[in-house]
């Protein structure tokens, strides 16, 4: 069943996802620029003693790295739900 409230809620969730994805991408890019490498390279460099980084900074970097695909997947699911809702609403 389609209602404006459902569509508004899905649109709101889509906007949240987009905002979080952009912020996360920006943080990942800033860290990559700061350290001159991406997370997998940084982890390797740390294990080899070629990188000094605070434990919390590395944990935050890893959290963002792992969260990004989850947010992207969530965004796709919301977009699909909204598209399905609009298709089913157009049948009535």
Residue ranges and their predicted role:
Residues 1-13, 46-49:
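Short, charge-rich amphipathic alpha-helices with coiled-coil/heptad character
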Residues 10, 14-24, 28-31, 61-64, ...:
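Amphipathic alpha-helical coiled-coil segments
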Residues 18, 22, 50, 83-86:
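Generic secondary-structure transition motif, activating predominantly at the C-termini of alpha-helices
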